[in-house]
Amino acid sequence: MTAGEDCRTILVAGTASHVGKSTVAAGLCRLLADRGLSVAPFKAQNMSNNARAVPVADGAPPAADPWGEIGVSQYVQARAARTAASTDHNPVLLKPRGDAESQLVVDGRAVGHYSAGSYYESHWADARDAAAAAHARLAADNDVVVAEGAGSIAELNLHDRDLANLETARFADATILLVVDIERGGAFASLHGTLALLPDDIRDRVAGAVITKFRGDRSLLDPGITEIEARTGVPVLGVIPHDDPGLPAEDSVSLPDPSERVVDGGQDGVPDAASVTVAVPHLPHISNFTDLAPLARTPGVRVAYQPLDAPLAAADAVVLPGTKNTVDDLRAAREAGLGRALRAFDGPIVGLCGGYQMLGDRITDAATESTADDLGAVDGVGVLPVETAFQPDKRVEAVTRELADCGALGGATGAVTGYEIHMGRTTVPDGVPQPVGPASAARGRVLGTYLHGLFGNDAARRGFRDAVFAAAGVEQPAPADTPDQSPSDAAAALVDAHVDLDPLGVPPAPDA
């Protein structure tokens, strides 16, 4: 079989959000790639503030900038598929910056900010064309495209404009694998109702369903599976146990409510008394919180997402994360007293992207970023001597930086890699240390940088860990054992062990 000939598209759709679509899709990508097939992930339209810088795809509309952005999940799935990520893997990205407005990104490039009504009325048709063209390019070069849907495939109010689900199924001629989560209860009712609400042409594409997040004795499900198959005519192709492979979360659905304090980490066997806590103020428009995942996996480190008005007294360090709306979130943080708390905090503080901008003295041209159009300038937290001006053009690029000694990173040095996605331009006065390359800044215990993925680098993560443990006066635990499997391999093992792929029409391996 030659790549591109009779390419099969499998659409991993769901009965709801957060049912495990991304995990199943990533598992399929790795499993099929390891069988010798050329595989590409795809999500026609994603809504997420977790984004990643990738090259603009060959064949995409030309642009001066060779870099664009896609959702983090599609980047992870591309790595799972053992292929280089590009903008074709997620051609339409919506990045919310308020309750009624999102930034539209098409083929990796920011187009503008629109309300839902404006997007659907004036831009959706072009977005659909871009998505269909991106899929066609992927299908021409691969044996299998593993497409991921969004939310529920049965949203009746969206059936005439559901780009990630119904439209993808149609223009990709996709076979659908329907994912239903049993952990929240009502799995059989959800599956039956979803199938009943699908248009006939879409329902006919459903090859089977898979139940995720199951705990307990698998055989206890058998009577329900037998009946749901009889009622719907759709086979249940597998039951995946509740076993998190450790893939990055796709969007804020996986985060706690902003009014709650929830700790990530703690599965390392290290007693809380021998651990340190990194507080992460839960900004209203938090973005790229996947930056914090490597810290939560570090032995002895607890990452605590907490309300803006929660005290920092129990924290040993603070990371102020990225945000899709720096100005509005800064105003919310100041009103909650977070600015005063940060100025009084005596442990390490790291600001990432929007969090870095907030730590500075001042932000100008604020209306470019805020949902309020009458702002000129706003004062920052004032713990870093920098100023940021927002501009209409966005910087998107994968970068390599050289670390220089700074307190917040425990004196770590060496090259680090990551990516930048931001519309602000930060001015750093002469004489202010820039330990993470141009436009970064440090003063005492505080560091600000635009580098997403900083803690994914061993040197930076270990340096920050060392600084936090030293500041807290806590002895570090012994290093943890390296996991036997990568998250992608773990996801593939779950799919391989628990899902029957034959009804999906997967092409045979090249040597089969």
Curated annotation (Swiss-Prot):
Keywords: Cobalamin biosynthesis, Glutamine amidotransferase. The active site is at residues 353, 452. Pathway: Cofactor biosynthesis; adenosylcobalamin biosynthesis. It comes from the Archaea. One of its GO terms (biological process) is cobalamin biosynthetic process. InterPro entries: Class_I_gatase-like (IPR029062), CobQ/CobB/MinD/ParA_Nub-bd_dom (IPR002586), CobQ_GATase1 (IPR033949), CobQ_synth (IPR004459), GATase_3 (IPR011698), P-loop_NTPase (IPR027417). GO terms for molecular function: ABC-type vitamin B12 transporter activity; catalytic activity. PROSITE patterns: GATASE_COBBQ. Residues 275-460 form the GATase cobBQ-type domain. NCBIfam families: cobQ, PRK00784.1. Catalyzes amidations at positions B, D, E, and G on adenosylcobyrinic A,C-diamide. NH(2) groups are provided by glutamine, and one molecule of ATP is hydrogenolyzed for each amidation. Belongs to the CobB/CobQ family. CobQ subfamily. PANTHER family: COBYRIC ACID SYNTHASE, DETHIOBIOTIN SYNTHETASE. This is Probable cobyric acid synthase. It comes from Halobacterium salinarum (strain ATCC 700922 / JCM 11081 / NRC-1) (Halobacterium halobium). The lineage of its organism: Archaea, Methanobacteriati, Methanobacteriota, Stenosarchaea group, Halobacteria.
